[in-house]
Amino acid sequence: GDLTLFTEEISDLELSKMTNSELRLLRNMIYAKYGHKFNSEDLNQLYSNFNWYNPNKKVSDSQLTKVEFDLVKRITIFETRQETEPSIKFGKEIIGIWHITPIMPSTWLDRFVISSDNKIEFLIDNFQKNPKISEYLGHYEIKGNTLIFYVEKLITKKETIELKEIQLLKFPITPVSEVTLMNGELTRKRIQIGSHEYFLFFGNPRI
């Protein structure tokens, strides 16, 4: 019930740690803070535990800030995770560096590195100054439309941390497709992991 959650950007990494039920509560909390009265009684009862909740109207998307509306859309994407569906099949097309922009600036931004032996890494934007964690390393599997990232190691500026208990990150994922950009001048392989699109690159992901 802490409304300060919404004062800073909530990353895909944070959303990936939450269950679909937790995501539903987080998404609806955005409407609850404006006094939205829900049709679902469990939501009304839950938010009634907080003194800031004053249900007196129906709140529409147009009443949200752009940051709040974008977060609702991103949470909704994560809520599409279905591990019990037939699994998306990937071959060699998933191997490589998946970068969050189709054109790389002067250095790498957020990227996933996926290897042929089911190893996976997530490396944080090089422009970020002193992130607490700069790299997540482990292995992955695909269940339904969900990439399950079993994090085994964390890398900080000072050390590599071997986790005693594996940390699970769960991202919705789409099949690989091809996109043409810049009026046909650039073609990239594209995949959606979490709420963002990533584009295929090769090379050294740590330069």
What do these predicted ranges mean?
Residues 1-10, 81-94:
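N-terminal low-complexity, Pro/Thr/Ser-rich intrinsically disordered segments
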Residues 10, 18-25, 93, 135:
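Short, well-structured alpha-helical interface segments that form or flank functional binding sites
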Residues 14-55:
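Amphipathic alpha-helical packing elements
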Residues 15-22, 67, 90, 132:
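Extracytoplasmic/periplasmic, Sec-exported soluble proteins
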Residues 27-34, 79-82, 102:
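Sec/Tat-exported extracytoplasmic proteins
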Residues 38-83:
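Compact alpha-helical subdomains of small soluble proteins
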Residues 84-137, 141, 148-207:
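Lipid interaction determinants
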